[in-house]
């Protein structure tokens, strides 16, 4: 499993020194350039090649990857060189994809600067770019390190905290310990200083991924809320943020759990509402179902759902379309 380090950014030089890279490149976006890039370059002694791409999910494409590969070639980047992804989920996804494919694999490190990336996108080795759908082209490639520092959350806009909060709620459904820790959190601003919740969320993901790196079995529980979530994102042309789509997906999964297993969906609805995340389906149920059928999570053309049986207990099964239409209609 990757080396996940909870530590201040000042520990970066010693982490990098252990890898002894030939060259170092840092991939970030134009929003983070002014916030964190200069600090990272300064920490690494200045001999760093910065690569800056536009901010946004719509730039997570094969065209962007080609531009980054071009820059790495011009920089004389080798397999023994280190690419650091500094940013949120878009950056870690595309940095991982580029590092895994350039010369069949370079050194890779992540400094996730958003809550979403810290608890989800930067953990577990999934990389990808969007192509007729979210992350349709990608690899499994574990980074050499993930440096998680809550200091990067100090500059994170509230909307991005909320974006990551949906994934934390997902872990609370999957794990009783995260659910317990969330009980005394009144609003999303408190998460900036709750390393314990971030750490526990990461631990849940790490435990699952260690059992099933390539998503052949148990890892699929991490897709809780994502079957509906990815369909919403796709239909919006990725204008709706990942977490805001997943929060609706979590409600749909909870409602399915209620119908199939008498799961108390109120526990999930309460969490989603407490953090002011969306609860209503923004598109017609039939459109959502059509988008789902194209998703990577559709197995043999069937729509496979991750369904809570109780907090900390999950079922994975294909759901009849009529039941799905009924549940989606209830949250429209």
Swiss-Prot record:
UniProt-annotated binding residues for NAD(+): 55-60, 89-93, 113-114, 126, 134, 152-155
UniProt keywords, alphabetically: Amino-acid biosynthesis, Aromatic amino acid biosynthesis, Cobalt, Cytoplasm, Lyase, Metal-binding, NAD, Nucleotide-binding, Zinc
Cofactor note: Binds 1 divalent metal cation per subunit. Can use either Co(2+) or Zn(2+).
Cofactor dependence: NAD(+); Co(2+); Zn(2+)
Top-level enzyme category: lyase
Record GO biological process: amino acid biosynthetic process; aromatic amino acid family biosynthetic process; chorismate biosynthetic process
Pathway it works in: Metabolic intermediate biosynthesis; chorismate biosynthesis; chorismate from D-erythrose 4-phosphate and phosphoenolpyruvate: step 2/7
EC number: 4.2.3.4
Localization per record: Cytoplasm
Gene Ontology molecular functions: 3-dehydroquinate synthase activity; metal ion binding; nucleotide binding
Broad class of where this protein is predominantly found: cytoplasm
Sites where the protein binds Zn(2+): 167, 226, 242
One GO cellular component, as annotated: cytoplasm
Catalytic activity, reaction form: 7-phospho-2-dehydro-3-deoxy-D-arabino-heptonate = 3-dehydroquinate + phosphate
PANTHER family, alphabetized: 3-DEHYDROQUINATE SYNTHASE (PTHR43622:SF1)
Function: Catalyzes the conversion of 3-deoxy-D-arabino-heptulosonate 7-phosphate (DAHP) to dehydroquinate (DHQ).
Family: Belongs to the sugar phosphate cyclases superfamily. Dehydroquinate synthase family.
Protein name stated in the entry: 3-dehydroquinate synthase
């Amino acid at each position: 499993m990757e080396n996940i380090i909870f530590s201040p950014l000042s520990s970066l030089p010693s982490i990098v020194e252990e890898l002894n890279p030939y060259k170092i490149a840092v991939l970030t976006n134009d929003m983070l350039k002014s916030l964190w890039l200069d600090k990272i370059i300064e920490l690494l002694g200045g001999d760093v090649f910065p690569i800056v791409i536009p901010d946004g999910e719509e730039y997570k494409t094969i065209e962007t990857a080609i531009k980054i590969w071009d820059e790495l070639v011009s920089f004389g980047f080798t397999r023994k060189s280190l690419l650091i992804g500094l940013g949120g989920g878009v950056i870690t996804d595309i940095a991982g994809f580029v590092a895994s494919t350039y010369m069949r694999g370079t050194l890779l490190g992540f400094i996730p600067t958003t809550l979403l990336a810290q608890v989800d996108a930067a953990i577990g080795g999934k990389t990808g770019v969007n192509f007729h759908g979210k992350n349709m082209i990608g690899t499994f490639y574990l980074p050499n390190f993930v440096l998680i520092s809550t200091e990067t959350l100090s500059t994170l806009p509230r909307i991005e905290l909320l974006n990551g909060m949906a994934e934390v709620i997902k872990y609370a459904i999957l794990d009783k310990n995260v659910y317990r820790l969330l009980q005394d959190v009144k609003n999303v601003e408190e998460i900036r200083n709750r390393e314990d919740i971030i750490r526990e969320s990461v631990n849940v993901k790490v435990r699952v991924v260690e059992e099933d790196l390539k998503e052949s079995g148990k890892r699929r529980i991490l897709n809780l809320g994502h079957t509906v979530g990815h369909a919403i994102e796709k239909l919006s042309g990725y204008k709706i943020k990942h977490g805001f789509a997943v929060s609706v997906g979590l409600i749909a999964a909870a409602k399915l759990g209620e119908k199939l297993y008498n799961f108390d969906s109120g526990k999930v609805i309460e969490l989603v509402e407490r953090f002011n995340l969306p609860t209503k389906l923004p598109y017609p149920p039939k459109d959502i179902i059509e988008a789902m059928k194209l998703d990577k999570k559709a197995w043999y053309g069937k729509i496979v759902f991750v369904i809570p049986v109780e907090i900390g207990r999950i079922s994975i099964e294909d759901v009849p379309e009529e039941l799905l239409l009924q549940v989606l209609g209830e949250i429209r």
